A protein has these predicted regions:
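Conserved class I S-adenosyl-L-methionine
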Residues: 117-145
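Conserved small/polar residues in nucleotide/adenosyl-binding loops
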Residues: 208
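A short glycine-rich, Lys/Arg-flanked "PGG" loop and its adjoining helix->strand segment in the class I
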Residues: 102-117
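Short alpha-helix
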Residues: 135, 145-168
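Conserved catalytic loop of SAM-dependent methyltransferase domains
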Residues: 164-192
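Class I SAM-dependent methyltransferase SAM/SAH-binding core
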Residues: 26, 30-79
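Class I SAM-dependent methyltransferase Rossmann-like catalytic core
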Residues: 1-33
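Hydrophobic beta-strand segment of the Class I
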Residues: 89-90
Length: 208
């Protein structure tokens, strides 16, 4: 049976959530000017809150089932957009709270144009946050209740859908520290609580 998850309506609902948001924005800042096209989908409330004003795509649409500031109310598994109509999609921890993350990824793939951009962030299970999932008193609380994917698993999914990964990183080792612990982030980035992937949908589809 699929696990029913309820995602936060804001980064502020997560312990140290504003630190996570700031850290993710710093990671993505160099990438936004490189994205181009006509339409950027920001899927879910955490995506909607991320600053994307430096993105070269001017038409940005916040999509979700409920919450403030959404332009489109829609089910992420049945997006009301034509196939290959969207230039870029941001999934900021959206898969982490998805009942069926792989199905959601396939639906996003459907609406993305060839060579479209996909940005995914999630929590890293091999981190201090990941350890929290092992503590009975914590595992039902945010953010420990979320799914935490290894980067290898996400990369496998993207490979199956024929995406080229242009950037991947783990960062923000100390969740309670605004800068994530600079020394540890420099020398032990693999233990970062957060992970991010920037990928592009490639047109040379492999025949299955």
């Amino acid at each position: 049976t699929l696990q029913k998850l309820t995602g936060p309506q804001s980064w502020a609902e997560l312990p140290w959530g504003e630190y996570y948001r700031e850290a993710l924005e710093r990671q993505l800042q160099p990438w936004w000017p490189k994205l181009f096209g006509f339409h950027l989908l920001k899927m879910g409330m955490l995506s909607a809150e991320l600053a994307t004003d430096k993105c070269a795509i001017s038409h940005q649409v916040n999509v979700g089932l409920e919450g403030e500031g959404l332009q489109v109310i829609a089910d992420a598994y049945q997006l009301p957009f034509a196939a290959k109509s969207v230039d870029a999609c941001l999934l900021a921890h959206t898969l982490s709270y998805a009942d069926d993350p792989h199905r959601m990824l396939r639906e996003v793939d459907r609406v993305l144009i060839d060579d479209g951009w996909l940005v995914i962030s999630s929590f890293n299970p091999f981190s201090l946050l990941g350890l929290g999932k092992l503590v009975p008193g914590l595992r039902r609380r945010q953010p420990y209740v979320s799914r935490m994917f290894t980067q290898m698993r996400l990369l496998d999914w993207l490979s199956l859908l024929n995406y080229e990964v242009l950037y991947q990183a783990r960062f923000h080792v100390l969740p309670w520290h605004r800068k994530g612990g600079k020394f540890l982030c420099t020398h032990l980035p693999a233990l970062g609580c957060m992970s991010v992937i920037v990928a592009r949908k490639r047109t040379d589809r492999k025949s299955v």
